[in-house]
């Protein structure tokens, strides 16, 4: 457990934290995702919408992936830990990370989503 906590603290210590400001994201803060395939589309829509309206904070793929990781729990969080430990290139590739999540959690979709 200590290792997981340290990993998450290291992720959160980065530039993801926005400077204090008055503007507030109008999109509700995304719920967590635990690996339930049926909830994956909803999770992706929630997180994508939240990041879309705040492009200043989520200005690159690494920040977007880091935000997704902060919303993972249970089996989904366990799944991502090896990627963090190995410093996988997927951590800097938002589309690639989403594609891997979809593959791992069994979500089949149309190419356009």
Swiss-Prot record:
Signal peptide (from-to): none
UniProt xrefs under InterPro entries: DUF4939 (IPR032549)
Stretches of the chain forming a coiled coil according to its record: none
Short name of one Pfam family: DUF4939
Domain of life of the organism encoding this protein: Eukaryota
Family to which the UniProt record says this protein belongs: Belongs to the FAM127 family.
Note: RTL8A is one of at least 11 genes called Mar or Mart related to long terminal repeat retrotransposons. They do not correspond to functional retrotransposons, but rather to neofunctionalized retrotransposons genes.
Protein known as: Retrotransposon Gag-like protein 8A
Organism: Homo sapiens
Upper lineage: Eukaryota, Metazoa, Chordata, Craniata, Vertebrata
Recorded name of the encoding gene: RTL8A
């Amino acid at each position: 457990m200590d290792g997981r906590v340290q990993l998450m603290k290291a992720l959160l210590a980065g530039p993801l934290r926005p400077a204090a400001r008055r503007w507030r994201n109008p999109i509700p803060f995304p719920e967590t995702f635990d690996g339930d395939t049926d909830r994956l589309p909803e999770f992706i829509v929630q997180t994508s919408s939240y990041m879309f309206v705040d492009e200043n904070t989520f200005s690159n793929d690494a920040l977007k992936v880091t935000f997704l990781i902060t919303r993972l729990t249970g089996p989904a969080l366990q799944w991502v830990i090896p990627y963090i430990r190995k410093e996988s290139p997927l951590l800097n590739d938002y589309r690639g990370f989403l594609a891997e999540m979809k593959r791992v959690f069994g979500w089949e979709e149309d190419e356009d989503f």
